[in-house]
Amino acid sequence: MSIQQNKRPVVIGVTGGSGSGKTTVSNKIYDQLHGQAIQIINQDTYYNDQSDMTMDERKAVNYDHPLAFDTDFLIKQLTDLRSNKAIEMPVYDYTQYTRSDKTVHVEPTDVIILEGILILDDERLRDLMDIKVYVDTDDDIRIIRRIQRDMVERGRSLDSIITQYLATVKPMYHQFVEPTKRYADIIVPEGGENQVAIDLLSTKIRDILVKRGHTELR
């Protein structure tokens, strides 16, 4: 579905701690709005370019701190998408702990879901969102999910995951991530298992789309 100039994209911010179920919530919203042009952008894509650092230096970075992200670049590109301009989105290489040389061409869509642990930390970024969602999940469940994900999808050892969790992930969650809950419009307990919250969010997004001229949804 093409997007007209007067139909500004709806931006949904989905945040919460690592392993909280952000991706599941985002994917379920995506599935419910399958009739619309919709895309998910992950904040991890905007980790800083660290190509000038050694591998040891890259591994020592605190990736759960706001300064680990190139937030200015994310704001610029999200602003472009909201203005119906295409972008060349960076690609992050988890195996090399830095940004890849590749980019992905991204066109503006009716709905943009921005997902990440610290997307509500910066006021400038919050101001670009129409709906801000915080996925609230118990710490024990989150660490179990993180272990499963990082071992299977990112090839990491159990020891390295636990070390990072205790050193940075857990303390940064309580220092930076959890406090952003106060900025959320909607708090979703139980993550992707909360179908009522998913349905309410999808209905609200459709309502915003109609108000912006998507009369085909009436």
UniProtKB/Swiss-Prot annotation:
It is found in: Cytoplasm. InterPro entries: P-loop_NTPase (IPR027417), PRK/URK (IPR006083), Uridine_kinase (IPR026008), Uridine_kinase-like (IPR000764). Its EC number is 2.7.1.48. One of its GO terms (cellular component) is cytoplasm. ATP binds at residues 16-23. GO terms for biological process: CTP salvage; UMP salvage. Signal peptide: none annotated. It comes from the Bacteria. This is Uridine kinase. The lineage of its organism: Bacteria, Bacillati, Bacillota, Bacilli, Lactobacillales. The gene is udk.
